């Protein structure tokens, strides 16, 4: 884009009566490439700080770098010298790409939009300055103060909305002589107003706002009148450019797709951000839904707020992966914009029907929810087209809640189930595809029997055929006495499409006792490929909003689990085999009698895999991880009472479970191993999440937030003599395809002279730049 702006200089030459007239010099030029957190005006050479809670991020612009705005915390206040700005003729040109629109005021209907200032120094009280603004509905407007009548505020409203997910050029031209102020989008005039042939007024003491309105409008601790996306260039000219010149300038703007993903540098000093678990590059996520496979990749769609790590005006995010552990965020798939989904695009499902991929989602306006439909424009599932409403609201006789559609087919019939409640008990409606449309007569697919045990409303229903006539039905109920957790039934689909469980009482998806009050894996998405049934779900971090604000993100997904049904009708869960490809050459393998503690050095850090097989005797056995001189996390099994416990009570951490677990997650194993039998513990640690598998049968995921940089050591232990076979690896999500291990350490190694990064991975030498750990202490290399 910088080259386009160079062309602007040349094009700003006009011919009047055969005489070449050189346009005035630029009044300001901000190329938005930040250095040391500062941007520079190329005209005045003044520098301005980028206000940001996290490290300032440059990303690729159209030409050179653009500044990334996160939609809730970062903006610029620039004291540009308005004494050099013309009062009679002005052109403002901005190259930008919006990921989303500014957040609406969640306390009001969306008919009252929020505006964010893209660039301007407008003083509404004194009617001085100007501002180009973007609304929460995508509308653009130009406002400016004029000398008319001792100060008058003019507005030029745009008639077209700014398109998200692409580069745009927004241009404003103010021309006193022609008595017109015009607003352009990508070279097309979309709005104008008269300006009473009056001078533009400026307030010399008023700073320019970039990416935020001058006021602070918040939802909780998050700013909402802020811009989310990229700004590449801002140029102010003391010249009124013609419409032809503006159109020519804008002709090259959409030459490339913007990449909104935050660079890794944003989280370089984070101890908590997972590396091989699915999640967006920033902002807020919740339920992942609609896992599918297309064009050589797995795709997971999810609830996303790009404008900050908090829940509001939901979009459908999209991540993809070739291996289910190294993830890339794709552009937003579905965004609010139609009358029926203006308040949010909530959860639903992705399914293939006649080799066509489809999305069904919950569309929410200011008063109700409907089920809407969308189809992809490409095999990569990047761009989607909305197809309108598929099911027009909830049938009568149900609770007000009606959301989260899920598609399945049985006996040649196509069905959709939708979460709801009936008579105070959770249920799902059943909709059958007949004569080109979905029925909506209030039929119930399945309903619980007790609101306290089964919830009063069911979120995120899922139906998966598991073979041998058996179906797996999962839901995440609200209103349960135990708080939010995911439960499941196994049963059959009847000829009319309804469901009959094998047992009236459901089971918990997570090992019993570990998941309650919204902890653990929730609302799974399930996909079948190559004979495997793969499950993953959201694992909320349960942190206060202020902590999420400082982190820049909220929540992530579990590791993929392979599930099946045992002969006794229970669900079996084990880690997906392909996760082995992350194993590095830093590893340990030992088989011996163990009594006491044994270091697993050099395997240490925050991205590790621990695999232990214990011959059950007496006492306790298990693993220590995140160990330092002052504490540790402990996973243990007590052979005397069959208790499996994950204990964080001595771990220095940011507590996220007070009042629910208080650092101790315990349960009695459903099948207690007897003396002489084997107990298998398989643990994956990724910074702030642990995925734990027991005997390739039970699983659970837990969040923890260690605060000490020295918490990196690992051990295996037993309080009485036991035979143990243990393997451990450091993991690296950048690895792919190879599961070979080149070196096996059979003896504990001294790590005091070794160097590690913040993820706990061993470095061959001191890095030239960044944070590293040596001898248990933190250093910064510049």
PLM regions: where:
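Terminal processing/anchoring signals of secreted or surface-associated proteins
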Residues: 1, 463, 738-744, 760, ...
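Bacterial Sec-dependent N-terminal signal peptides
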Residues: 1-24
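Extracellular glycan-associated modules
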Residues: 24-51, 57-260, 265, 593-611, ...
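Short strand-turn-strand beta-turns centered on an Asx-Gly dipeptide
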Residues: 184-187, 693-696, 759, 775
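Beta-rich carbohydrate-recognition and catalytic domains
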Residues: 244-404, 408-453, 467-517, 537-589, ...
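Residue-level detector of functionally pivotal "anchor" positions at catalytic/ligand-binding pockets or at interdomain
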Residues: 258-260, 734-759
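Beta-rich accessory regions
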Residues: 262, 494-519, 525-737
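C-terminal tail/sorting-segment detector
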Residues: 771-782
């Amino acid at each position: 884009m910088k080259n386009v702006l160079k062309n602007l200089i040349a094009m700003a030459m006009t011919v009047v009566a055969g005489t070449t007239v050189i346009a005035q010099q630029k009044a300001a030029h901000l190329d938005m490439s930040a250095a040391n957190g500062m941007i520079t005006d190329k005209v005045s050479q003044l520098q301005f700080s980028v206000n940001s809670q996290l490290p300032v991020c440059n990303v690729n612009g159209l030409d050179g770098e653009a500044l990334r705005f996160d939609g809730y915390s970062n903006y610029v206040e620039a004291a540009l010298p308005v004494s050099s700005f013309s009062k009679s003729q002005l052109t403002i040109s901005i190259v930008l790409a919006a990921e989303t629109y500014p957040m609406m005021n969640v306390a009001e209907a969306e008919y009252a939009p929020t505006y964010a200032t893209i660039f301007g120094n407008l003083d509404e009280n004194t009617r001085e300055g100007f501002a180009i603004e973007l609304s929460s509905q995508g509308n653009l407007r130009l406002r400016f103060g004029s000398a008319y009548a001792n100060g008058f505020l003019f507005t030029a409203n745009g008639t077209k909305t700014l398109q998200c997910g692409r580069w745009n050029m927004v241009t404003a031209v103010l021309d006193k002589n022609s008595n017109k102020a015009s607003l352009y989008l990508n070279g097309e005039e979309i709005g104008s107003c008269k300006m009473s042939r009056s001078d533009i007024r400026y307030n010399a003491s008023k700073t320019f706002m970039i990416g935020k309105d001058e006021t602070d409008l918040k939802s909780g601790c998050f700013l909402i009148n802020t811009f989310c996306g990229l700004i590449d260039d801002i140029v102010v000219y003391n010249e009124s450019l013609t419409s032809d010149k503006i159109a020519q300038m804008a002709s090259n703007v959409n030459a490339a797709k913007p990449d909104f993903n935050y660079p890794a540098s944003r989280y370089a000093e984070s101890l908590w951000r997972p590396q091989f678990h699915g999640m967006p590059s920033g902002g807020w996520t919740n339920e992942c839904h609609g896992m599918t496979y297309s064009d050589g990749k797995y795709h997971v769609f999810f609830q996303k707020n790009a404008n900050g790590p908090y829940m509001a005006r939901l979009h459908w995010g999209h991540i993809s992966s070739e291996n289910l552990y190294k993830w890339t965020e794709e552009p937003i798939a579905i965004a609010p914009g139609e009358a029926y989904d203006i308040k949010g695009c909530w959860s639903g499902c992705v399914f293939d029907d006649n080799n066509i991929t489809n999305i069904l989602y919950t569309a929410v306006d200011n008063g109700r929810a409907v089920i809407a439909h969308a189809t992809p424009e490409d095999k990569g599932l990047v761009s989607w087209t909305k197809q309108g409403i598929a099911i027009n609201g909830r049938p009568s006789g149900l609770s007000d809640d009606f959301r989260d559609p899920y598609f399945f087919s049985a006996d040649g019939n196509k069905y959709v189930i939708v979460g709801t409640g009936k008579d105070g008990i959770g249920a799902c409606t059943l909709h059958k595809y007949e004569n080109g449309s979905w029925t909506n007569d209030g039929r119930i697919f399945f309903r619980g029997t007790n609101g306290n045990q089964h919830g009063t409303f069911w979120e995120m229903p899922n139906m998966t055929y598991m073979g041998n006539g058996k179906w797996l039905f999962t839901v995440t109920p609200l209103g349960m006495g135990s708080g939010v957790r995911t439960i499941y039934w196994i049963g059959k689909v009847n000829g009319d499409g309804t469901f009959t469980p094998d047992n009236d009482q459901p089971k918990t998806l997570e090992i019993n006792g570990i998941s309650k009050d919204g902890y653990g894996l929730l609302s799974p998405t399930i996909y079948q490929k190559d004979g495997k049934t793969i499950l993953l779900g959201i694992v909320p971090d349960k942190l206060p909003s202020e902590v999420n604000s400082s982190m820049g993100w909220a929540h992530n997904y579990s590791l993929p689990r392979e599930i099946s049904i045992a002969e006794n009708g229970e669900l079996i869960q084990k880690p997906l085999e392909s996760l082995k490809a992350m194993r590095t050459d830093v590893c340990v393998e030992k088989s011996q009698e163990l009594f006491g503690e044994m270091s697993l050095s050099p395997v240490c850090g925050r991205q590790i895999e621990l695999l232990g097989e214990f011959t059950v005797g007496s006492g306790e056995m298990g693993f220590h991880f995140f160990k330092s001189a002052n504490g540790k996390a402990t996973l243990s099994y007590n052979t005397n009472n069959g208790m499996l416990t994950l204990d964080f009570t001595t771990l220095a951490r940011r507590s996220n479970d007070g009042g629910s677990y208080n650092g101790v997650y315990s349960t009695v194993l459903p099948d207690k191993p007897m003396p002489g039998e084997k107990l298998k513990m398989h643990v994956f640690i990724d910074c702030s999440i642990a995925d734990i598998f027991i005997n390739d049968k039970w699983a659970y995921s837990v969040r923890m937030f260690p605060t000490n940089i020295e918490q990196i050591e690992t051990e295996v232990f037993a309080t009485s003599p036991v035979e143990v076979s243990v393997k451990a690896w450091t993991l690296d999500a950048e690895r792919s395809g190879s599961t070979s291990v080149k070196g096996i350490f059979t003896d504990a190694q001294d790590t005091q002279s070794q160097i590690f990064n913040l993820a706990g991975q061993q470095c061959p030498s001191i890095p030239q730049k960044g944070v590293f750990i040596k001898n248990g202490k933190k250093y910064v290399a510049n």
